[in-house]
Amino acid sequence: MKKRALITGASRGIGEAVARRLAFEGYDLCLVCKNSIEKLRLLAGELKAESGISCEAYACDVSDPQQVISMLQQAGQIDVLIHNAGISHIGLLSDMLLEEWNRVIDTNLNSCFYLSHELIPQMVHRKEGKLLFVSSVWGNVGASMEVAYSASKGGINSFTRALAKELAPSNIQVNAVAFGVIDTQMNQCF
């Protein structure tokens, strides 16, 4: 039976590259982004035409639990989650507003909870599933001028380790990939 993967942050960069690879591997896809839905629809159409897969595009702000619930209800069964959506805020912590801190933590870390909380019951029922969270080397070593981003990615690392232990008896794999600096639009300032 064909596997179905949901990829957040799929309209560009790492998310787009992962979508292209999984389409090549024959996965049916649910592509998710917050702002670039027209670009995402074009990508979905391209992947369908090239690979003959089912590929749907969803607009969803993963920092909003109600949008996550609604999107997942539309998407249906998901076998693999690749949670790539993320944002950063560059600047001194002392200059950062609480709203900016919360936006980074909600988008990068709390969204892991929102997505997992909704997907885990169906995966436990099937006794199968994969959850993959995109982290960063900054989650392990920290980065000056990116305290919120570093904290959110460190949180993802701990979240992943704990959830992997919790879900291992249900045959659900939980992992994180901690990238270094990748040449994406998000990192153009480096």
How does the language model describe each region?
Residues 25-42:
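Conserved glycine-rich Rossmann-like NAD(P)H-binding loop of the short-chain dehydrogenase/reductase
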Residues 11-12:
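Conserved glycine-rich cofactor-binding loop
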Residues 94, 141-147, 169-170:
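Active-site loop immediately N-terminal to the catalytic Tyr-X3-Lys motif
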Residues 121, 165-169:
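Alpha-helical segment proximal to the catalytic Tyr-Lys
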